[in-house]
UniProtKB/Swiss-Prot annotation:
The lineage of its organism: Bacteria, Pseudomonadati, Pseudomonadota, Gammaproteobacteria, Pasteurellales. This is DNA mismatch repair protein MutS. PANTHER family: DNA MISMATCH REPAIR PROTEIN MSH1, MITOCHONDRIAL, DNA MISMATCH REPAIR PROTEIN MUTS FAMILY MEMBER. Keywords: ATP-binding, DNA damage, DNA repair, DNA-binding, Nucleotide-binding. It comes from Histophilus somni (strain 129Pt). The gene is mutS. Coiled coil: none annotated. The keyword DNA damage applies. The keyword DNA repair applies.
Length: 856
């Protein structure tokens, strides 16, 4: 902690501002640089790979310093934000000329990973979300804000697993949490963690803040008033957003409650295994989003990814999306609309910057271009009756368009402070000041020629810099010829600089004109915001509508290009997919993809899948999940036909990985995921199980796999694909209704194997493990030895087939016995609660039947 005594006036000012912003890096404007001092300088030097120097002394100690040029700040901010750091931007707000002591400075904004709106700092095709968590006992409130669109949502989660799944879905770049949060291990993997005091989560404060933001008396109109934990989180989040932006947030105009029942639930493991927007290596190649996303606007790409991560269960909405896609294809409007939509660009984020008054001149020209496309887009939409509602959501912006066309030049400078942004003819006073300022060039050329002639100095020239203003420069070799009325202003190595009364007078006149011109231009620029902001709500609705139109047009193009079909929805539980294909694998393969059917229903709800490694079991399972998910975002699907029943959740238990950081083995991770499925799945869930029970002994693994399959088939009755190498499980269809065997085919000839990748009814005859090992390049001597050992084991197996059968019977018996014990204990507990003296004969008979039923 630095005290202010004995420091220079400038360092006192710095330390005072730093004390007000202790938890962020302070970028302190000094001339053409942003400087950092003390610990901030050391940290920035390390993170940004810039030089760490010293700035003289203050209070008797050298001051560590690092700095970046003001014109290059965006690149450095982008790097810091990506690393999860926050930065306070401290600007000079006073005039250096009239300042007594240090120029007045103040923090104008705080840039944090989750509240940035600058185009250079944002990932173009990904949402940039900030979230807040509030915990009470085992329940959580979650608030999520997209500062770049104003979308504000809350939800309430009943347990840690649900919270993890939701955080995995939204992937916040900044995460606020209460200092009272107990389960901190849930958030340790996220960057941009911010610990907040408990008082910021008070419900009464939250309600007051939200009502003030939306201009309402209560929150009933938003349907969030009963979500107490979510509101507590929202209050903290809104307060933080206001603190960092240092301005009003007019683009945040509503708040909504996200209900789990509205969406198909997908847990963190399933998102990872299905590679929706990120592959298993952490990249974006060969993901579902990479195949589906050919949107022509960044806001369309972001919306499509939201749909992928949050499939909806509202069949009416889904069928509406399907109809829109069908109409776009029938009317051949994809090629007409996409060039127009491409010109709309990222209207959503531009409007956020308009709301925050941080929009740059080129943002306004892009907004102008977007508004110019709207009449043409609406004209195309009138060709389709189904799109009337779309067209009605886009208001008439002809007044706002005319304003931007009159006010802003075609190719403005990057920043308003550079001047020359407002178009000629927009404001008469501005035009007058500019003519005075621009007349300086001609005057100075005339003066330079006149002075050369008067003095006979051919190296004489007139120049200007920000520190010394206008000057006459003469080379050192001719400086002795300077007239007596030339007053020396600056000495350089090779030249002398002078001022004369005439030039000084003109300088004051020109600087006044330039200053007045810039000041008026900034004022006019701010007035443009004043004229746009009353229409912000309509503009935001239009941008959201255009983003959705982009997604639907994109899905129509994908359906046509990739030969997708419209799936049908059924009220009957089940899936019937004819000749389904994996949407990603079919695009990556050089050879034609082998399509396969899937049939799951209430009489056929668990498929035991056997077959060789590399045979296509995992691909078959994943494609079933992806086709189902695509149907639930409203997309067409890769199949000949598809009928999809109600789905509430999609679960996967695929692949093997350990969690060394948490001290969990591969088997422990596998069992944790399996436990989650067994606790959460319902008869409307789609469950994919790939090789359960491999990480332990054979009998342990077989017992667990058997018991899990039995539970899923008999108790839960979920729609399940169950891949296994335990051939013992192929007898399950004989014992339990609803279980069926299927296998992936392969042909072996002369030690060579050909995978047919075709799904067939019945169990596989063998696993072809040695053939796959040979394909993988295992040395031939090892393969030969393995074949000999296999023959020995097969002979031994035939001799002990009775013993093997007894082991299998024992596994069944133990599981049945455990179930019988559970039933018996339930009967005993019921009997303990009965008093025979209080039962009528009829009640006693009913109890007897009930107990008999429990035992059976």
């Amino acid at each position: 902690m630095h005290t202010f005594e004995n420091h220079t006036p400038m360092m006192k000012q710095y330390l005072k501002i730093k004390a007000e912003n202790p938890d962020v890096l302070l970028f302190y404007r000094m001339g053409d640089f942003y400087e950092l001092f003390y610990d901030d300088a050391k940290k920035a030097a390390e993170l940004l790979d810039i030089s760490l120097t010293k700035r003289g002394q203050s209070a008797g100690q050298p001051v560590p310093m690092a700095g970046v040029p003001y014109h290059a700040i965006e690149g450095y901010l982008a790097k810091l934000v990506h690393l999860g750091e926050s930065v306070a931007i401290c600007e000079q707000v006073g005039e250096p000329v009239i300042a007594k002591g240090p120029v007045e400075r103040q923090v104008v904004r705080i840039v944090t990973p989750g509240t940035v709106s600058d185009e250079a700092l944002l990932p173009e095709k990904q949402d940039n979300l900030i979230a807040t968590i509030y915990q009470e006992k085992t329940q959580f409130g979650l608030a999520v804000l997209d500062m770049t669109s104003g979308c504000f949502q809350i939800s309430e989660l009943q347990d840690a697993a649900s919270l993890q799944a939701e955080l995995q879905r939204i992937q916040p770049v900044e995460l606020l949490y209460s200092e009272a949060l107990e389960d901190k291990h849930l958030i340790e993997q996220f960057k941009g963690l911010r610990r907040r005091p408990l008082w910021e989560f008070e419900l009464s404060t939250a309600i007051q803040l939200l009502n003030r933001q939306f201009g309402t008396k209560d929150l009933r109109g938003f349907g969030v008033e009963k979500a107490v934990l979510g509101l507590c989180a929202a209050g903290c989040l809104l307060q933080y957003a206001k603190e960092t932006q240092r301005t009003a947030l007019p683009h945040i105009q509503s708040i909504s409650l996200l209900q789990n029942s509205d969406t198909v639930q997908i847990d963190a493991s399933t998102r990872r295994n299905l590679e929706l927007t990120q592959n298993l290596a952490g990249g974006t190649e060969n993901t579902l989003a990479a195949i589906l996303d050919k949107c022509v606007t960044p806001m369309g790409s972001r919306l499509l990814k939201r749909w992928i991560h949050q499939p909806i269960r509202n069949i009416e909405k889904l069928q509406c999306r399907q109809q829109h896609i069908q109409m776009l294809l029938q009317q051949n409007l994809v090629e007409e609309l996409q060039p127009l939509l491409r010109q709309v660009g990222d209207m959503e984020r531009i409007l956020a910057r308009v709301a925050l008054r941080s929009a740059r001149p080129r943002d306004l020209t892009r907004l102008r271009t977007a508004l110019e496309q709207i009449p043409f887009i609406q004209h195309q939409l009138t060709k389709i009756p189904h799109f009337v509602a779309f067209s009605q959501q886009i208001a008439d912006f002809s007044v706002q368009l005319a304003l931007l066309q009159r006010a802003i030049i075609d190719n403005p400078p990057l920043l308003i402070r550079d001047g020359g942004v407002i178009a000629e003819g927009y404001n008469e006073e501005l035009d007058e000041w500019r003519s005075l300022s621009e007349g300086a060039t001609r005057y100075l050329k005339d003066l330079e020629q006149r002075e050369r002639a008067n003095t006979g100095i051919d190296t004489l020239k007139i120049g200007f810099n920000a520190v010394h203003g206008y000057y006459i420069q003469i080379s050192q070799g001719q400086a002795h010829k300077a007239p007596l009325h030339y007053v020396r202003r600056q000495t350089l190595k090779n030249a002398e600089r002078y001022i004369i009364p005439e030039l000084k007078t003109y300088e004051e006149k020109v600087l006044k004109a330039k200053g007045a011109s810039l000041a008026l231009e900034k004022q006019l620029y701010d007035e443009i915001f004043d004229q746009l902001l009353p229409h912000l709500g309509d503009l935001q609705l239009a941008s959201l509508t255009l983003a959705e139109l982009d997604v639907l047009t994109n899905l129509a193009e994908r359906a046509e290009t990739l030969n997708y079909v419209q799936p049908q929805f059924s009220t009957q539980i089940g899936l019937q997919i004819m000749q389904g294909r994996h949407p990603v694998v079919e695009q990556v393969l050089k050879d034609p993809f082998i399509a396969n059917p899937v049939e799951l229903n209430q009489k056929r709800h668990l498929l035991i899948i056997t077959g060789p490694n590399m045979g296509g079991k995992s691909t078959y399972m994943r494609q079933t999940a992806l086709i189902t998910l695509m149907a639930y975002i409203g997309s067409f699907v890769p199949a000949e036909s598809a009928v999809i029943g109600p789905i509430d959740r999609i679960f996967t238990r695929i692949g093997a990985s350990d969690d060394l950081a948490s001290g969990r083995s591969t088997f422990m991770v596998e069992m944790t995921e399996m436990a989650n499925i067994l606790h959460q799945a319902t008869e409307q869930s789609l469950v994919l199980i790939d090789e359960i029970g491999r990480g332990t002994s054979t009998y342990d693994g077989l017992s667990l796999a058997w018991a899990c399959a039995e539970q899923l088939a008999q108790k839960i009755r979920s729609l399940t694909l169950f891949a296994t190498h335990y051939f013992e499980l192929t007898v399950l269809p004989e014992k339990i209704d609803g279980i069926h065997n299927v296998h992936l085919d392969a042909i072996e000839h002369n030690d060579n194997i050909a995978f047919m990748h075709s799904i067939q009814e019945g169990a596989a005859s063998k696993s072809y493990g040695l053939a796959v090992a040979a394909l993988a390049g295992v040395p031939q001597n090892v393969i030969k030895s393995a074949k000999q050992k296999l023959k020995q084991l097969e002979t031994l197996s035939q001799q002990n087939s009775c013993q093997s059968q007894s082991v299998l019977t024992q596994v069944q018996g133990e599981l049945t016995l455990m179930e019988e014990e559970e039933n018996t204990s339930a009967v005993i507990e019921t009997l303990k609660t009965l008093d025979p003296n209080e039962l009528s004969p009829k009640q006693a008979l009913e109890c007897l039947y009930q107990l008999k039923k429990m035992l059976n």
